[in-house]
C-alpha cells in the first residue's frame, strides 16, 4: 500500500487516497482530510464521523447512506448538505474508512 503524509503524519492509503489502517486515524487527520475536500468540520460532522467509526468497528464495513440515516437518525438530505456531492464517499474518506461498497 502507498504511504502519504497528511497533517505531518505518514499514513497508508489505497490508490484513491482512502486510509487503509483504521488505527492511523485521529481528529487532527480528519480535519486535514476534510480540508482537502473543502469541508470545515462542525459538531454535526463530528457526530456522523464518530457514528461511522463506531459502526465500522462493530460491523466490519463502512456504513451506507441509508444505514447512517436510519441508525444515526440523520436525514439523507442533511448528509448531502454536510458532505455535498458524494456524501457516502466523502464521509468515509474523512472518517478514515474504506470507500463504501457500491461507491464509484
Residue ranges and their predicted role:
Residues 13, 65-104:
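Helix-rich interaction surfaces within compact, conserved domain-sized segments
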Amino acid at each position: 500500500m502507498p504511504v502519504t503524509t497528511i497533517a505531518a503524519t505518514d499514513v497508508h492509503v489505497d490508490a484513491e487516497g482512502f486510509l487503509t489502517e483504521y488505527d492511523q486515524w485521529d481528529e487532527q487527520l480528519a480535519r486535514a482530510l476534510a480540508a482537502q475536500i473543502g469541508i470545515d468540520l462542525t459538531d454535526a460532522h463530528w457526530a456522523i464521523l464518530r457514528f461511522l467509526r463506531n459502526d465500522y468497528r462493530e460491523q466490519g464495513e463502512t456504513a451506507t447512506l441509508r444505514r447512517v440515516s436510519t441508525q444515526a437518525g440523520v436525514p439523507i438530505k442533511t448528509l448531502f448538505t454536510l458532505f455535498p456531492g458524494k456524501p457516502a464517499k466523502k464521509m468515509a474518506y474523512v472518517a478514515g474508512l474504506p470507500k463504501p461498497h457500491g461507491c464509484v
